């Protein structure tokens, strides 16, 4: 008799995706982040659902409802901090996942890569709207500053901003719609994840060498299931440690002050995972130019497959490209640091240099160095 997992209409889909899926035998721990992101999404949806049962999306009560969750709801503080720090873990895994794709040339699977970029935008939008919900000072002013950037769009900008706000400033209507979209978007993300996996399973996984692995495949279960479970345990241990020992480490103390439209915080900045993009935005003196640079800082990932000039897929055997890759990582760390600093000398100039370097490495230096490496190999 054939096993039910191979005949049942639903189980056979799961079987072909997670059990009998042929996978390259050489996948390193860098391939764990896809499944870790799945766990992050599940944790965020579950904790978010329980938080939404107690949260009120009204300007008069939003801040107090979050305080009520932390003080009066059973394990409400755990839920709240799991959700807030879970977002940080989500972005750590996201950036490492994208970095892995860049390093090992996974972007040559263009459909999977492009859906991934769409997912990145969707998760960023979700995180931004979630940050507004506690209705603290940084929530309110962050929402005001970031939504106001849309006014830089010629002709329709001002109308667009007022349409998003639902009035002439960030107010009750804005908070209510942000809550609605913050609740809805993770389910759209979950649907996009399915499409992401669908396209991935059309081609099969890449591997660290970048060489086709068809002759050397192993079943996903038990080899990679057990490896993924180890990854889950490590990540959930790190998240638990963060939540239980220093839950406010990655947050902003200003967000414990209720939102006040009459009092601007001394330094408005987003959560740490957006600081690199915020630094790029601020490094251009022109408003529209800054907004374009902000969008392009993520959208630039879409042109990476087009600019792939190397005859090898992975950077594993390309030391010059490796140097540029790690330089890019250093530039991103620099931008993240600059995004959290005030707008004054010398931070402004450091941010501008780092922003130019960021775009230069991806658009100019990497394609050129790949051509040089091809020549060095006498291909």
From Swiss-Prot:
Record localization: Mitochondrion inner membrane
Entry keyword set: Electron transport, Heme, Iron, Membrane, Metal-binding, Mitochondrion, Mitochondrion inner membrane, Respiratory chain, Transmembrane, Transmembrane helix, Transport, Ubiquinone
**Chain positions recorded as heme b b562 binding sites:** 83, 182
Task: Provide the binding site for heme b b566.
Answer: 97, 196
Question: Which residues make up the binding site for a ubiquinone?
Answer: 201
Complex and partners: The cytochrome bc1 complex contains 11 subunits: 3 respiratory subunits (MT-CYB, CYC1 and UQCRFS1), 2 core proteins (UQCRC1 and UQCRC2) and 6 low-molecular weight proteins (UQCRH/QCR6, UQCRB/QCR7, UQCRQ/QCR8, UQCR10/QCR9, UQCR11/QCR10 and a cleavage product of UQCRFS1). This cytochrome bc1 complex then forms a dimer.
Question: What's the miscellaneous note?
Answer: Heme 1 (or BL or b562) is low-potential and absorbs at about 562 nm, and heme 2 (or BH or b566) is high-potential and absorbs at about 566 nm.
Functional summary from the UniProt entry: Component of the ubiquinol-cytochrome c reductase complex (complex III or cytochrome b-c1 complex) that is part of the mitochondrial respiratory chain. The b-c1 complex mediates electron transfer from ubiquinol to cytochrome c. Contributes to the generation of a proton gradient across the mitochondrial membrane that is then used for ATP synthesis.
Return the protein name: Cytochrome b
- What gene does this protein come from? MT-CYB
